[in-house]
Amino acid sequence: MQIKKDDNHQELDKYNHMSLQKILAISGKPGLFELKIQTRTGFVAESLLDGKKITVGMKSNVSLLSEIAVYTYNEEVKLAEVFKAIATKENEGPAISHKEDNAVLVNYFREVMPEFDEDRVYPSDIKKIVNWYNMLQAKGLISIESLNQEVKKQAAE
C-alpha cells in the first residue's frame, strides 16, 4: 500500500508510527517529549505540548514510556498494555481528566486495570498515566492497533 504524502500526511504518518520507545517523560518538565537525536552530552527532545526542542543532559532523570510498568498483584504490566486497556474502555477516545479527585482516579483505574496493586500504585502515578494517555490521544498517537504492535514488540524483547 502506498500513501501519498504531503506536509499534513507526513505529520500524521510520523505520529501514527511513533513508538513509545521514542516518547520520554523528563523529571521536572511538564508533558511528554519525543526523542529527536542523541548528542555527545545527552540528547535533543521535542515537547509534544508545544513543539519546542530542548537539550537534555545525561544527568537528567528521564524515563522512556516503553520502560515504565504498573505493579499488579501478579506481575508488572507495561504501560503500552495499560494504555491499550484505557483505549479499549474509551473506544480510543480521551480518558477522564487527570485533575479529577484522587478517589475518582483510583476508581477509574480500577475499572481499567482491576488487578493493579493499590499499595504500590499511588494516585499520583494514576494521575500521570491518565495525563500521558490523554496527551498521546490528543496527538492521534493512541490506537488499539498500534498499541497491540507495541505490546508484541515489547514482549519479543
List PLM regions with ranges.
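Detector for Asparagine
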Residues: N8, N16, N61, N74, ...
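N-terminal amphipathic/basic-hydrophobic helices that include classical n-h-c signal peptides
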Residues: M1-H17
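Intrinsically disordered, low-complexity regions
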Residues: D7-N8, K52, M58, L141
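Conserved phosphate/pyrophosphate-binding and hydrolysis machinery centered on Walker-type P-loop NTPases
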Residues: T72-E76, A95-N102, D119-I126
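C-terminal charged interaction modules
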Residues: V104-E157
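The feature represents the first ordered module of a protein
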Residues: H17-S97
